[in-house]
Amino acid sequence: MSLLEQLARKRIEKSKGLLSADQSHSTSKSASLLERLHKNRETKDNNAETKRKDLKTLLAKDKVKRSDFTPNQHSVSLSLKLSALKKSNSDLEKQGKSVTLDSKENELPTKRKSPDDKLNLEESWKAIKEMNHYCFLKNDPCINQTDDFAFTNFIIKDKKNSLSTSIPLSSQNSSFLSLKKHNNELLGIFVPCNLPKTTRKVAIENFNRPSPDDIIQSAQLNAFNEKLENLNIKSVPKAEKKEPINLQTPPTESIDIHSFIATHPLNLTCLFLGDTNAGKSTLLGHLLYDLNEISMSSMRELQKKSSNLDPSSSNSFKVILDNTKTERENGFSMFKKVIQVENDLLPPSSTLTLIDTPGSIKYFNKETLNSILTFDPEVYVLVIDCNYDSWEKSLDGPNNQIYEILKVISYLNKNSACKKHLIILLNKADLISWDKHRLEMIQSELNYVLKENFQWTDAEFQFIPCSGLLGSNLNKTENITKSKYKSEFDSINYVPEWYEGPTFFSQLYLLVEHNMNKIETTLEEPFVGTILQSSVLQPIAEINYVSLKVLINSGYIQSGQTIEIHTQYEDFHYYGIVSRMKNSKQILETNTKNNISVGLNPDILEVLVKIHNTEDFTKKQFHIRKGDIIIHSRKTNTLSPNLPNTLKLLALRLIKLSIQTHALSDPVDLGSELLLYHNLTHNAVKLVKILGTNDISINPNQSLIVEVEIIEPDFALNVIDSKYITNNIVLTSIDHKVIAVGRIACQ
């Protein structure tokens, strides 16, 4: 065969082979699609069956392995313990059956479930039932609930009773031991297995000890029991029934107030002012002697006492008022003195109140300014020392008290409804032999200051030269008859012929008569009193009484009425009943008179008050001070219909002041510390605000409204908001220079 034939044959065979392959391929595609689907399904089933068999086999093997050893506290996890308790018995049985059936069908060699596994499942169910049974019987007295193994012991005891007849002893003991160990794992103290044995033992011992909270509670209980043992319970005496406070006590005497006021003597208050050693006390003492207020025998006793003192600073008339040992030794007045005069030498139905004030700069502000504000006198008596160089020193010295006094009294005169009167006594005229030229020079200088600087008119002031030691020009000798015999204390009434003016007493007499035309006290005025002096008496039959010296600033008071005493350092106030009242005098001799039933403005009375024994009042804590305020009980108005009930009492720490400044050497800035004088009190305050302006300082000669705050923390200023009370104040610097005078703006 040729080469071409062979090649052709190969091509034919090749084409036949390709055709048969295509046919077979197409037939296989059409025929094997279903077959391939069946094959794939069988393959997947086989794979899933194999995987399922493998998983079941692994689970079965794992169960067999877990049943080969006894679980302990450290190998069994908490999740396995909880899962064993949560699964139901039926689920476990079904799972077991499904596992055995699948293993038989697949003919895989697996181990059968051991009887120990079945026993463990049954014991788990029994344990759950026993736990429920224990919870139901937990109140059984045979169970010690404080024991950590109470539950396990209960189960063991119950098992012994239930299985003693049916289970052999060996299996019973092993079952109980395994159950106890299982319960210990659930309810015992967990300690990591990797710890040493000694550490585990110490940890368990620590948990068995009391906790820190238990230790604290035990200590508290022991302390309480100890105090309870030491407690001595005594029978508490019954509290005494306190007398209820009657706020509607009527007066002890029924008096027609209208007729009493109409016949009551009218008073003129005269306040003596001046520099130290100006002779105020000597002059006033001699005047009291001339007014028959001091007897001859008393004067001789005083003369003996004054003979032992320095004659340059003391005399018989001076020691009448300087009646304390300190004042007599120092030779100058230190305290104010108040004298009330009521005798036949005065006009009918009139009284005279004389007030002596200290002139020393150390006591000037404390006593003098408070006296001016408290007593609000109708007459100011300015005593001037006319001796050579004395007048000039008083003007040129660093503390020009005369000018400071004129600042205060001039403002009060300008803003008072009733104009004041000023008497200027040119004292010690005998030491200059009544030098007319010198007396006129002093008078001219003061006249200019009063008119130009302080706007006094000629009718409001009067100059009177005199001698307080000799009594010259104090009073005419023929008007007073003390004795038919002459005395060494009688006035030497030497007055030069060129003087044609009045004597001091004659001028007072005219002012007393003029004062009788003033408006009388009305029933609308509320009763307000200022305590000048306080003393606590010994309790009488367990009833507390206090004796008070009271200045009546407004209205009237009757014996038997209930009053309120308001202190300035405490938040509470006292209630009391006025037991009795009598006129007060602060000189050596006092005429003993019967008690009075009514006190009027401006009387100074000694008042005995019965204090209600409230909780705030004790014998050791009784605080009534000078400057405290007495008012009518504001709840009384039924039994005494005439009593006013419109009084408003304010306790202020932040105070608004309407002031008039004077000539100042330096402006007073905000935040500066000042002294505020009001009635008998003076307190340090801080300048807080200047109202109505953007200024940050107080300048001279300004009318301002300012706010000040009291620095002392426990003090509140008692202020009466009434048109009958003036509430005048004085502001001074720390070195006692008068800065401004004004009044408290209550509104």
Swiss-Prot record:
Q: Quick one: where's region G3?
A: 356-359
What GO cellular-component annotations does this UniProt entry give?
A: cytoplasm; cytosol
Q: Where does GTP bind?
A: 274-281, 356-360, 427-430
For this protein, the record's InterPro entries field holds: P-loop_NTPase, Ski7_2nd, Ski7_3rd, T_Tr_GTP-bd_dom, TRAFAC_GTPase_members
Q: Name one Pfam family in it.
A: GTP_EFTU
Q: Where is the tr-type G domain?
A: 265-503
Q: Does the keyword Transmembrane apply?
A: no
Annotated region G5: the residues are: 467-469
Name the major location: cytoplasm
Question: Residues annotated as region G1?
Answer: 274-281
GO MF annotation: an example: protein-containing complex binding
In this UniProt entry, the residues modified to Phosphoserine are 88, 90
Ranges annotated as biased composition (Polar residues): 21-31
Domain of life where this protein originates:
Eukaryota
Its annotated compartments are: Cytoplasm
Region entry G4, spans: 427-430
Instruction: Extract the ranges annotated as region (Disordered).
Output: 14-51, 89-117
Record remark: domains: The N-terminal domain (residues 1 to 264) is required and sufficient for interaction with the exosome and SKI complexes and for 3'-to-5' mRNA degradation.
Subunit field text: Interacts with the exosome and with the SKI complex composed of at least SKI2, SKI3 and SKI8. Interacts directly with SKI3 and SKI8.
- State the function annotated in the UniProt record: Represses the expression of non-poly(A) mRNAs like L-A or M viruses and is therefore involved in antiviral system. Mediates interactions via its N-terminus between the exosome and the SKI complex which operate in the 3'-to-5' mRNA-decay pathway. By interacting with NAM7, is also required for nonsense-mediated 3'-to-5' mRNA-decay (NMD). May recognize a stalled 80S ribosome at the 3'-end of a nonstop mRNA which leads to the recruitment of the exosome and SKI complexes to the mRNAs to be degraded.
As a miscellaneous remark, the entry gives: Present with 233 molecules/cell in log phase SD medium.
* Family, similarity comment: Belongs to the TRAFAC class translation factor GTPase superfamily. Classic translation factor GTPase family.
Name-wise, this protein is Superkiller protein 7
